Amino acid sequence: MTSYIRTFTLNHLRHITFWLVLLFSWQSWAESYVLGVVPQQSARKLAQVWVPILAYLSKKTGDSYSFATATDIPTFEQRLLEGAYDVAYMNPYHYVVFEEASDYQAFAKQADKEIVGLIVVDKLSQIAELDDLNNLDVAFPSPAAFASSMLPRAELKRRGITIHPRYVLSHDSVYLNVARGFFPAGGGIGRTLNNFNPELKENLRVLWKTKGYTPHAFAAKASMNEEAVKRLQHAMLEMHDDPEGEILLREIGFKAISAAENSDWDDVRALQLNALDELIQH
């Protein structure tokens, strides 16, 4: 009886040891990461669509991804400078700045898509062309919001049209302010306009569009585990082939995600923009 108990206990301990080794092996492989999303919309709205996406990607990669954003775009820029996010979804200008300043490396982007900036006005407005904006207040998300702010302002300046920029912190705030008549016009992009409140969007009209540029980047810190980045990239690229993944992509206005590399944003670098030089130099 004593021998049986000793054998049973030994086998039981071996069994426990096996599972502990397996558990610790899995824990040493699985990692936890924070993915920061540029706050073009409210944190609540972003969380509604991105938290399920990150749960899906966590399941597919075996790693753990948690959602993060910031109260406004300037705060997000400061956190990018500090390298606060392991992975970030950032606008094209942010990427060319923080690739150099904070060592973020792009690995994916929205597939078959260029980012196009817009200027919107009230649909009943008498404003018919860009010249009509001369000497008016125009709403923008932030100074360094690429397609929704930097490109429209550059075009207005090139045409000799003087405006008074008013920064309202997010794309949704721009649309809301224009739809409710607080500003005669504002800058945005197609994806966020399409995702805006349908009833209020009915009050808006697109006055003008920019040319297209390489879209937002998914970029990881260079210090992030290389295999984890590969797992994440693979899971993202496979999403459109999976019914669940396809539905999640649709929630953020994507059809698919494609692989990306640093040189994809050379079209943005060629513009030689400097809106964040002061932030970087501090």
Residue ranges and their predicted role:
Residues V34-P39, L46, D131-S148:
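Short loop->beta-strand "edge-of-pocket" segments that line small-molecule binding or catalytic clefts
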Residues S25-W26:
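N-terminal signal peptide c-region/cleavage motif recognized by signal peptidases
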